Amino acid sequence: MVSEVREVTGRAIPLVGNDIDTDRIIPARYLKAITFDGLREGAFIDDRTALKGAHPFDQPQYQDANILIVNRNFGCGSSREHAPQALSKWGIQAVIGESFAEIFFGNCVAIGVPCVTADEAIVKQLQELVAANPQANVSINLETLQVQVGDFIAPISIGEGTRSTFITGAWDACGQLVANTEQVRVTAAKLPYVSWGKLAAS
């Protein structure tokens, strides 16, 4: 079955700062990994090491949070699909910020992690609300295009095509293949290069 993403709810991590690039999200040395499974430990590892426990990803009040609140131009720098994968392995299921680097945004879509935008003032208020109450419930609704933290509700944005991709589950290419197994078999049977061995034998 395809995985529709209509709403993401949970707790959030406020990560303040503009132009946080992919090398900070996951350093280049982690790109040697054969699979993405071990990338959790590398998420923001250099920043976390330098801050000696003061980084939001290390602070106890933000553990197990699944929404990331960032600022402007998040995910800029070199193109690496490992960056959203590292966030996903950490447990991040959605990101809200002022703006995102285009390739990072696309890589997030490919793994089912919506990146929604909001005005600078709204993002700042969201970060402050979560910092004041890390246990607050945060909801990102792709159907109503709203974010809610407690009594605070604000508009969010995401391209209509991308929004539709999440709501319908079209982002999930593997899920679509599984859901349409019979059609895949029928199509494959008609392809000459798939049945070449049978034709040669006959």
From Swiss-Prot:
GO terms for molecular function: 3-isopropylmalate dehydratase activity. Pathway: Amino-acid biosynthesis; L-leucine biosynthesis; L-leucine from 3-methyl-2-oxobutanoate: step 2/4. It comes from the Bacteria. One of its GO terms (cellular component) is 3-isopropylmalate dehydratase complex. Keywords: Amino-acid biosynthesis, Branched-chain amino acid biosynthesis, Leucine biosynthesis, Lyase. Its EC number is 4.2.1.33. The keyword Amino-acid biosynthesis applies. It catalyses: (2R,3S)-3-isopropylmalate = (2S)-2-isopropylmalate. Gene3D superfamilies: Aconitase, domain 4. InterPro entries: 3-IsopropMal_deHydase_ssu (IPR004431), Aconitase/3IPM_dehydase_swvl (IPR015928), AconitaseA/IPMdHydase_ssu_swvl (IPR000573), IPMI_Swivel (IPR033940), LeuD (IPR050075). SUPFAM superfamilies: LeuD/IlvD-like. Heterodimer of LeuC and LeuD. This is 3-isopropylmalate dehydratase small subunit. It comes from Nostoc sp. (strain PCC 7120 / SAG 25.82 / UTEX 2576). The lineage of its organism: Bacteria, Bacillati, Cyanobacteriota, Cyanophyceae, Nostocales.
